[in-house]
């Protein structure tokens, strides 16, 4: 056995590719061929594809050192194949590739020296070796045949008598062969060369008549090579017969690449049918070769689907040594075709051939043929026909009785005669001697010469047609063809006198005979008088001369183009005129003589000339079409712009109206809070009341806008939706991590973009829908929005001691790779080099790269002391992202008033120059900063997020202590012009000194610090790393940085409001590289995909013509879930008039899978039975519609919509009925529908299914349930095979044949498991319905495979939101404390704290309460009620005394402000109780949320539903009971469950149902989380289903003692209980482990 040799050869650019400036996308290195995808960015995983072959020939540029010539190709492939033929093997070489890729050049070559192809070289070398080795004991004989396969028709190219299409037959020994194909004997290479030339000319004549090109046909040149050797010792003659098949395939390009239309498109499809079948054969053979030897199933190879593959059957995977040469183009414009060719060749490389030496086959063959002839004669004699010996044609009937004649059948007689004639032809061919073969070859040559002479084709004196030489004196015509290989192959002499041209049917013999469309019987006459040739057209004949239609006679000039009819193109050549022109050059018109050279006119030139002269200018037509397209584009663009402008105006008007409405509602609600309750009892229009007239000041309007903006950015519900909706993905990732033994854990976390915790770009939130903006942008009020919070995934890498943050999108992307790592095998070609799993997945999806240094925390130092100017030494806290203080940093900031340059012995001194430029942009001042380091100037745009000092003043004014405000005094002192050191235009230098860091944990080894301005994140000033010994001693940096700034307004504004950010980094001690650890990159190879069972995808419902597109199911709470078992049957009309279920093949052994075996042309019905546990919530009323569509021959449905699917059919229905099954108390509902499959107008359903094919359909049943607003939809994909009307649809395997299950009619059904969810229907117009529909279900409790390995781990939920609010509160307090501390230090430095402001007793009490609140977490602060004595709530350090009513009111007001509440004067405890009471007992989710809000006491939403209801208001009246009943509607949702193919356990169990009659032996299969119950192991239909996810499993000795039955355990579902007994003692634990592994582990 040996595999097919595959070589790839790339050709140079052609003129078309050069004109388009194509790029080379092919690279070759050794035997590896690489192709680059020009449509994919370089560097990606799909940009370069590599393939390995036996040979890779680089023939792109002759100047390259690696250039491969024709002789090199022959030396590698041709010589090896020729040696195999001498050894007695069959040999085949075939070339494959798109048109113009170089197939014909590689196989045939050119006439020039060293340009010959593989075929001439093999023939030449064959006869050279014959001459060298032939002797007395060794004789050779060579025969050749040449045929063409075009559109599945075979044509003989060597025998002119075989004008028709030859038949392809198959012999038991010879295999497929072509009947009556000429096999001509040859004795030298010149004979073969002449025959090839003759065959090409016959191919040219036929192609011209039929308007074909050689690129659209396959050519097969076969050499039959026989060796006869005489053994001297035994005097026996042995014989070896080798067959050398040389195949030139048709072009493999696509239809859209060639632009073919009409007939040429159909022709291409027919030709591509052969190539497609060849591809299928190669793929099937490669699949067989890659399968294991244990596979006993016979694989089907589609040889008979095309003539080409049928004839090449021995060469493809049979008795042959085969080589394939794939010719490819190097241009990027042919990427798709080139890649297809490379993949084709890659598959062919895997084919294994089993070649044997062909010895002494003739004697055996002759004997078997004689025996077959004798049997056929006896068969004919029995039928009443006697065939005499030697009579091969006409049978002689015997005299027989009339009864005997009536028994004869004409078809069998004709078939027997046909077989007899074919066998006798083979015997005659085998018995023909070599001399007879040579004589027959000579006769065929003479016949061929006569035929060519009759057609007018010029021949030499020896009878060979003119091909490569041109006459020296006689004028002549040379053919031109679209295919360059067929051009200038035929030459027609113009004799002296008249040369007539027409068809063979003319009354007067024609000298030149043509055929084809638009050629008249007498078409034209060439008159040669004294060397001057005149073309005389006949009436109504289509004759074109140089593109002009010829009506009158005209003299021909050498080089003229003559077109006769539609297809025949010639160039007229007169040697005498050409010689005169060379001697006396004259200026000729370019149109009459292109380029001054007659030979330059080819077929393309003649066609373009014809179009141009007939008034069809291609360039003008293209320009005209282009102009029309441009005009159309302009019109469409103008219309689109106008439509867009109208939509923009409409949306702007709607936005303005909504904005105005929101503002009015906000102002109305503000007025409500100040309106007295008694005023509402007065009967008047409240909006006419002057109280509701807007009389706000600018400050009040700003506060209202601020409150609205703050309310708009609350996002607790969306965060909860993200947590609930993605919990299942988090659980699955953790489960896979545990099963693969990855040391990675995933958990939810919340991230907010703050100063201490800026978000990286990959985690930055997207814009809020509805008008909100992203971070860093300003809203319509000119204010920076509140930072958004996102849900992220915290990845704890315990292997590397690292922590990463992933976005939810990244988690889903990585989860796909985790699933692929766990389930699927990377599909790579076995011949592809550098096989590496990591090249596909990009590394391990569980791990990320981690930096060497990690962030310890951030600090902020304000610079307002430089305004005065005074030096300050700051001690600022180093705070991490969670608000934890990780240490302290001492930083000194001081102005440099003169050019001092003191020496710093222990520190580092550096200088930098920063320029603040002012730029006006949209009315906002934006500092544009540029920094100069080492005299290099860089411009960096600054940030527009600038805090204004006036805001601080407003905050102090709100506190009621304007007289003691720190910022107000500093602001007043700085209202005047800045000091002399900050005059605009001057330069100001200040110094930042990083002194020490204290309190940093010992887990960080090397500590260094970076600091920069807020608007400059890309460049920073950095200190040197300092060792951290962990002893607690301060870490001294003593880094000095001088900064010089030209003073501008932007710089002064920055000094007033903005700090410098300091980032402290440390090297983590537990870094794995400390121990020279290396990341384990080994990835366990996943199981092959072929080991996993094939699955039919779950389709979406087929759209109903009656109901139309149904709205999306609501996201309301699921009230109930039920497991539904559905049985599907297709019934056919039986002879007794009843509808019997069609046979279902369950041979796949997969759950809920089967194949319907139907008959063609029989009436059918579809029967569906629904089985479920009895419940009051599910009551089936009737079937409303049954729709069948999406008819296809592959499992996956097409992407087209049901609207465009013409095969969708609504079936006629029969009323549904409720069944009562004796002994089964489950609910059964069954309905039927009449199915006339012919109404689909689908060929797949109308015809008998082909071998190896299956038909798939999708049906959807729309059922009506009680108390449901919408129909329930059952959707199922069914597969089937349609046999003939009288065919037997039996089982396909012996297992099912002997099991007898097909004799059971109840086995001929298919099961489906569905989950019915009932949701509360929501009114579309109810308030807040859109917000409620946005909520998602909590998926944290959904079962995930492998969840039991997590040992109780759960994803975090609502508590994470409140914990994060406390973290944000800590960050806000730390930021404000740092700013106030800086201002207090500055006041003290300036001497402004000499007279401290008096503090009242009330303020002290408020401060004490605030201190107590800050000392404990927020969720521990429970405010006391006013009735509780204050002394019980105070700390022991405060004096005990009663508060006055005024003090109590102030205390509660301050506490509410701290806790972020806005409300009236009611008691908070009363409000909490009211909220708890209002929560509906049935809505557990809402009750839990309210409880968490109450217990949390954190910041609440400032929405109207959270505002305390003033006294005197009445709650809305409850809904009447009758109205509530009428609105109690559900929305059903039926979803098919994909049952796992993995069987955890199966076997017999004794089953006792609760309330059942007794124990029953049943076959039970566990496919988690379901248990299926069958009647027996031979029963293929699921009879009952148990859902383990909602069941309780118990096994105890007490239970066994109570029932007095050993080896039992119980399974209790929501509706019934089962008692299961195993057949043996040892099986109990195994069954428990399959059903409930945790319970089995506890028992064991």
Swiss-Prot record:
Residues 574-598, 953-985, 1419-1440 are annotated as: Disordered. Residues 1428-1437 have a biased composition (Polar residues). Residues 3-351 form the Kinesin motor domain. Its main location: cytoplasm. Residues 1542-1640 form the PH domain. Pfam families: DUF3694, FHA, KIF1B, Kinesin, Kinesin_assoc, PH. ATP binds at residues 97-104. It is found in: Cytoplasm, Cytoskeleton. InterPro entries: FHA_dom (IPR000253), Kinesin-like (IPR022164), Kinesin-like_KIF1-typ (IPR022140), Kinesin_assoc (IPR032405), Kinesin_motor_CS (IPR019821), Kinesin_motor_dom (IPR001752), Kinesin_motor_dom_sf (IPR036961), P-loop_NTPase (IPR027417). SUPFAM superfamilies: P-loop containing nucleoside triphosphate hydrolases, PH domain-like, SMAD/FHA domain. Keywords: ATP-binding, Coiled coil, Cytoplasm, Cytoskeleton, Microtubule, Motor protein, Nucleotide-binding. The keyword Coiled coil applies. GO terms for molecular function: ATP binding; microtubule binding; microtubule motor activity. GO terms for biological process: synaptic vesicle transport; vesicle transport along microtubule. Required for presynaptic maturation, has a role in axonal transport of dense-core vesicles carrying synaptic vesicle precursors, components required for the morphological transformation of axonal growth cones to mature boutons. Belongs to the TRAFAC class myosin-kinesin ATPase superfamily. Kinesin family. Unc-104 subfamily. This is Kinesin-like protein unc-104. The gene is unc-104.
């Amino acid at each position: 056995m040996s595999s097919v040799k595959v070589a790839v050869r790339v050709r140079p650019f052609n003129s078309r590719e050069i004109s388009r400036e194509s790029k080379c996308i092919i690279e070759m290195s050794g035997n590896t061929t690489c192709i680059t995808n020009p449509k994919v960015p370089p560097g990606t995983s799909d940009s370069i594809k590599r393939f390995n072959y036996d040979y890779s020939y680089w023939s792109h540029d002759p100047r390259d050192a690696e250039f491969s010539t024709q002789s090199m190709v022959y030396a590698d492939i041709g010589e090896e194949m020729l040696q195999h033929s001498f050894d007695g093997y069959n040999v085949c070489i075939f070339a494959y590739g798109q048109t113009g890729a170089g197939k014909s050049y590689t196989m045939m070559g050119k006439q020039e020296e060293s340009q010959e192809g593989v075929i001439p070289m093999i023939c030449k070398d064959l006869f050279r070796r014959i001459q060298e080795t032939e002797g007395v004991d060794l004789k050779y004989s060579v025969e050749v045949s040449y045929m063409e396969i075009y559109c599945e028709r075979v044509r003989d190219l060597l025998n002119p008598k075989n004008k028709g299409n030859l038949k392809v037959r198959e012999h038991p020994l010879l295999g497929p062969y072509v009947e009556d194909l000429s096999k001509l004997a040859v004795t030298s290479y010149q004979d073969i060369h002449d025959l090839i030339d003759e065959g090409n000319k016959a191919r040219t004549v036929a192609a011209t008549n039929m308007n074909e090109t050689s690129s659209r046909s396959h050519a097969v040149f076969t050499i039959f090579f026989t060796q006869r050797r005489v053994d001297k010792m035994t005097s026996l003659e042995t014989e070896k017969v080798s067959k050398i098949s040389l195949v030139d395939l048709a072009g493999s390009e696509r239809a859209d690449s060639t632009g073919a239309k009409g007939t040429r498109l159909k022709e291409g499809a027919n030709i591509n049918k052969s190539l497609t079948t060849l591809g299928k054969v190669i793929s099937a053979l490669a699949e067989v070769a890659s399968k294991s030897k244990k596979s006993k199933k016979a694989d089907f190879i589609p040889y008979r689907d095309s003539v080409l593959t049928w004839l090449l059957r021995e060469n493809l995977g049979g008795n042959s040594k085969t080589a394939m040469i794939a010719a490819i183009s190097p241009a990027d414009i042919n990427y798709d075709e080139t890649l297809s060719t490379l993949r084709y060749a890659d598959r062919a490389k895997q084919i294994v051939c089993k070649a044997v030496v062909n010895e002494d086959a003739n004697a055996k063959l002759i004997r078997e043929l004689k025996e077959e002839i004798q049997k056929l004669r006896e068969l004919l004699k029995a039928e009443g026909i006697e065939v005499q010996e030697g009579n091969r044609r006409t049978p002689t009937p015997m005299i027989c009785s009339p009864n005997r004649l009536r028994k004869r059948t004409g078809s069998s007689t004709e078939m027997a005669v046909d077989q007899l004639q074919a066998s006798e032809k083979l015997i005659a061919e085998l018995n023909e001697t070599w001399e007879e073969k040579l004589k027959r070859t000579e006769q065929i040559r003479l016949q061929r010469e006569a035929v060519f002479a009759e057609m007018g084709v010029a021949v030499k004196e020896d009878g060979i047609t003119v091909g490569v030489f041109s006459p020296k004196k006689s004028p002549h015509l040379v053919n031109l063809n679209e295919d360059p290989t067929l051009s200038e192959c035929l030459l027609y002499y113009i004799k002296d006198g008249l040369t007539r041209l027409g068809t063979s049917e003319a009354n007067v013999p024609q000298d030149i005979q043509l055929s084809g469309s638009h050629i008249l019987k007498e078409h034209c006459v060439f008159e040669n008088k004294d060397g001057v040739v005149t073309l005389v057209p006949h009436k109504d004949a289509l004759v074109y001369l140089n593109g002009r239609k010829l009506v009158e006679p005209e003299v021909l000039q050498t080089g003229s183009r003559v077109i006769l009819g539609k297809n025949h193109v010639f160039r007229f050549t007169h040697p005498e005129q050409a010689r005169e022109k060379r001697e006396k050059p004259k200026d000729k018109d370019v149109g009459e003589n292109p380029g001054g050279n007659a030979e330059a006119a080819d077929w393309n030139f003649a066609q373009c000339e014809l179009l141009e002269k007939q008034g069809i200018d291609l360039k003008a037509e293209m320009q005209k079409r282009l102009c029309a397209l441009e005009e159309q584009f302009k019109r469409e663009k103008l219309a689109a712009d106008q439509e867009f402008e109208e939509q923009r105006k409409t949306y702007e008007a709607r936005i303005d109206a909504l904005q105005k409405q929101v503002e009015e509602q906000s102002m109305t609600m503000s007025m409500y809070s100040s309106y007295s309750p008694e005023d509402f009892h007065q009967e008047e229009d409240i909006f006419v009341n002057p109280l509701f007239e807007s009389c706000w000041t600018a400050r009040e309007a700003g506060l209202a806008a601020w409150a609205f903006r703050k309310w708009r950015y609350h996002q607790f519900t969306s965060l909860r939706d993200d947590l609930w909706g993605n919990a299942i993905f988090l659980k699955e990732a953790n489960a896979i991590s545990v099963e693969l033994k990855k040391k990675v854990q995933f958990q939810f976390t919340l991230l907010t973009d703050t100063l201490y915790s800026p978000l990286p770009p990959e985690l930055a939130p997207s814009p809020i829908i509805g008008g909100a903006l992203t971070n860093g942008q300003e809203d319509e009020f000119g204010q920076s929005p509140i930072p958004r919070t996102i849900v992220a995934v915290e990845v704890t890498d315990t292997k590397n001691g690292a922590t990463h943050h992933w976005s939810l999108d990244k988690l889903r992307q990585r989860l796909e790779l985790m699933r692929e790592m766990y389930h699927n095998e990377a599909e790579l070609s076995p011949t592809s080099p550098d096989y590496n799993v990591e090249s596909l997945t990009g590394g391990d999806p569980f791990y990320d790269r981690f930096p060497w240094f990690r962030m310890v925390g951030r600090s902020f130092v304000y610079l307002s002391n430089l305004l005065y100017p005074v030096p300050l030494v700051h001690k600022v806290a180093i705070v991490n992202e969670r608000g934890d203080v990780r240490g302290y940093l001492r930083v000194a900031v001081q102005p440099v008033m003169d050019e001092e340059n003191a020496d710093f012995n222990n520190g580092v001194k550096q200088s930098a120059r920063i320029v603040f430029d002012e730029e006006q942009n949209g009315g906002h001042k934006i500092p544009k900063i540029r920094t100069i380091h080492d005299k290099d100037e860089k411009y960096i745009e600054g940030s527009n997020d600038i805090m204004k000092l006036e805001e601080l003043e407003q905050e102090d004014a709100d506190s009621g202590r304007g007289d003691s405000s720190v910022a107000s005094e500093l602001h007043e002192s700085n209202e005047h012009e800045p000091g002399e050191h900050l005059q605009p235009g001057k330069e100001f230098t200040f110094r930042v000194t990083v002194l020490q860091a204290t309190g940093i944990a010992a887990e960080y080894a090397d500590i260094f610090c970076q600091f920069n301005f807020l608007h400059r994140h890309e460049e920073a000033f950095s200190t040197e790393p300092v060792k951290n010994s962990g002893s607690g001693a301060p870490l001294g940096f003593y880094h000095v940085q001088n900064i010089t700034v030209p003073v501008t307004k932007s710089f002064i504004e920055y000094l007033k409001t903005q700090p410098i950010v300091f980032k402290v980094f440390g090297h983590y001690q537990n870094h794995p590289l400390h121990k020279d650890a290396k990341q384990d990159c080994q990835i366990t190879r996943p199981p092959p995909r072929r080991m996993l069972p094939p699955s039919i995808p779950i389709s979406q419902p087929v759209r109903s013509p009656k109901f139309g597109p149904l709205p999306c199911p609501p996201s309301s709470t699921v009230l109930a879930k039920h497991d539904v078992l559905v049985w599907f049957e297709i019934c056919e009309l039986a002879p007794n008039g009843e509808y019997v279920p069609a046979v279902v093949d369950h041979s796949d052994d997969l759950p809920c899978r089967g194949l319907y075996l139907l008959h063609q042309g029989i009436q059918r019905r579809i029967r569906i039975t629904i089985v479920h546990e009895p419940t009051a919530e599910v009551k089936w009323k009737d079937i409303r519609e049954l729709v069948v569509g999406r008819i296809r021959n592959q499992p996956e449905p097409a992407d087209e919509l049901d609207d465009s699917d013409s095969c969708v059919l609504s079936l006629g229905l029969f009323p549904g009925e409720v069944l009562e099954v004796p002994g089964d108390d489950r609910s059964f509902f069954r309905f039927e529908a009449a199915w006339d499959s012919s109404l689909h107008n689908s060929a797949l359903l109308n015809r008998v299914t082909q071998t190896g094919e299956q038909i798939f359909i999708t049906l959807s049943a729309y059922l009506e349930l009680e108390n449901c607003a919408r129909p329930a939809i059952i959707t199922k994909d069914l597969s089937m095979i349609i046999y003939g009307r009288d065919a037997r649809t039996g089982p396909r395997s012996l297992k099912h044949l002997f099991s007898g299950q097909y004799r059971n009619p109840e086995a001929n059904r298919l099961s489906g498991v569905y989950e019915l969810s009932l949701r509360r229907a929501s009114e579309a117009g109810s308030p807040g319905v859109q917000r409620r529909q946005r909520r998602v279900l909590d998926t944290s409790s959904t079962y995930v495979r492998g969840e039991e390995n997590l040992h109780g781990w759960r994803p975090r939920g609502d508590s994470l939101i409140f914990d994060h609010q406390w973290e944000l509160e800590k960050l806000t307090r730390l930021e404000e404390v740092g700013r106030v501390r800086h201002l207090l230090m500055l006041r003290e430095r300036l001497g402004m704290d000499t007279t401290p402001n008096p503090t009242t007793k009330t303020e002290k009490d408020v401060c004490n309460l605030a201190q107590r609140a800050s000392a404990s977490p927020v969720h521990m602060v429970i405010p006391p009620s006013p009735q509780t004595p204050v002394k019980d709530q105070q700390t022991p350090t405060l004096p005990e005394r009663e508060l006055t009513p005024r003090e109590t009111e102030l205390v509660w007001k301050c506490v509410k402000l701290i806790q972020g509440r806005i409300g009236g004067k009611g008691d908070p405890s009363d409000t909490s109780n009211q909220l708890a009471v209002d929560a509906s007992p049935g809505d557990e989710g809402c009750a839990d949320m309210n409880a968490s809000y109450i217990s949390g006491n954190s910041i609440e939403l400032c929405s109207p539903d959270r505002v305390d209801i003033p006294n005197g208001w009445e709650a809305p009246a409850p809904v009447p009971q009758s109205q509530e009943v009428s609105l109690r509607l559900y929305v059903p949702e039926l979803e098919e469950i994909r049952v796992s193919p993995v069987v955890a356990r199966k076997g017999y169990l004794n089953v006792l149902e609760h309330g059942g009659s007794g124990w029953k032996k049943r076959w039970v299969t566990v496919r988690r989380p379901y248990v299926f119950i069958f009647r027996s192991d031979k029963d293929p239909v699921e009879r009952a289903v148990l859902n383990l996810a909602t069941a309780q499993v118990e096994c105890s000795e007490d239970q066994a003692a109570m029932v007095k039955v050993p080896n039992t355990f119980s399974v209790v579902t929501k509706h019934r209980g089962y008692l299961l007994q195993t057949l043996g003692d040892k099986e109990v634990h195994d069954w428990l482990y399959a059903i409930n592994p945790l319970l089995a582990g506890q028992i064991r």
